[in-house]
Amino acid sequence: MSADDQKRISGEAAAELVEAGMVVGLGTGSTAAWFVKALAARKLDIRGVPTSEATANLARELGIALTALDDVKSIDLTVDGADEIGPGLSLIKGGGAALLREKLVWEASKRCVVIADAAKHVKTLGKFPLPIEVVRFGHVHTGQRLADIAAEFDLLPPRLRMADRGVVVTDGGNVIYDMPSGVIAEPAALAAALKTVTGVVDHGLFLDLADEALLGTDQGVVKLVP
């Protein structure tokens, strides 16, 4: 089974968790897109809270009613992808440059389910470069401070994310620095250190937020819990 098929079946399994009347957080990325498509096919009376403009556009095209995070007291269920799923369902997210809105939606949710293909499940976080969202003003200086923190944790200095069109800018108008790491031995300590840097909006370490994971594998969908 291809990685894309594994993403698809995990997204379809997650869509079965949604019940009529729910407020549902809609994740961002290729795996989350499969969930949004499967959810739309069920034609339930729900409201979606998108984590990016890209997801909002897809949901509208598919006929899913949307609402803003500030217009709901809480979110019943959020389903989102991840770049890596490590021990205890610790996650690296942010490959789609939507980590800030994703984390805001996750933290407002009663239940969070992460979906992914089997390759995303790792023994130790860090092979995927850690995204860090940074205020655009003075970001070069912020990047230098991040490099100092990286050195403290025996990690490589972060790099400003670029695309064919130039610097990648998030929906919130910020930029992304990606920290190549290889192995993040102390995720909680690194997360705390990154938050001490003025100019850092947030980072892609999602710790103690996921309630379960649905992995698409060649044998079907496998459920993981912390």
From Swiss-Prot:
<feature type="active site" description="Proton acceptor">
    <location>
        <position position="102"/>
    </location>
</feature>
<dbReference type="GO" id="GO:0004751">
    <property type="term" value="F:ribose-5-phosphate isomerase activity"/>
</dbReference>
<dbReference type="Pfam" id="PF06026">
    <property type="entry name" value="Rib_5-P_isom_A"/>
</dbReference>
<feature type="binding site">
    <location>
        <begin position="28"/>
        <end position="31"/>
    </location>
    <ligand>
        <name>substrate</name>
    </ligand>
</feature>
<dbReference type="GO" id="GO:0005829">
    <property type="term" value="C:cytosol"/>
</dbReference>
<feature type="binding site">
    <location>
        <begin position="93"/>
        <end position="96"/>
    </location>
    <ligand>
        <name>substrate</name>
    </ligand>
</feature>
<comment type="similarity">
    <text>Belongs to the ribose 5-phosphate isomerase family.</text>
</comment>
<protein>
    <recommendedName>
        <fullName>Ribose-5-phosphate isomerase A</fullName>
        <ecNumber>5.3.1.6</ecNumber>
    </recommendedName>
</protein>
<dbReference type="GO" id="GO:0006014">
    <property type="term" value="P:D-ribose metabolic process"/>
</dbReference>
<dbReference type="InterPro" id="IPR020672">
    <property type="entry name" value="Ribose5P_isomerase_typA_subgr"/>
</dbReference>
<comment type="function">
    <text>Catalyzes the reversible conversion of ribose-5-phosphate to ribulose 5-phosphate.</text>
</comment>
<comment type="subunit">
    <text>Homodimer.</text>
</comment>
<feature type="binding site">
    <location>
        <begin position="80"/>
        <end position="83"/>
    </location>
    <ligand>
        <name>substrate</name>
    </ligand>
</feature>
<comment type="pathway">
    <text>Carbohydrate degradation; pentose phosphate pathway; D-ribose 5-phosphate from D-ribulose 5-phosphate (non-oxidative stage): step 1/1.</text>
</comment>
<keyword id="KW-0413">Isomerase</keyword>
<dbReference type="GO" id="GO:0009052">
    <property type="term" value="P:pentose-phosphate shunt, non-oxidative branch"/>
</dbReference>
<dbReference type="InterPro" id="IPR004788">
    <property type="entry name" value="Ribose5P_isomerase_type_A"/>
</dbReference>
<dbReference type="InterPro" id="IPR037171">
    <property type="entry name" value="NagB/RpiA_transferase-like"/>
</dbReference>
<feature type="binding site">
    <location>
        <position position="120"/>
    </location>
    <ligand>
        <name>substrate</name>
    </ligand>
</feature>
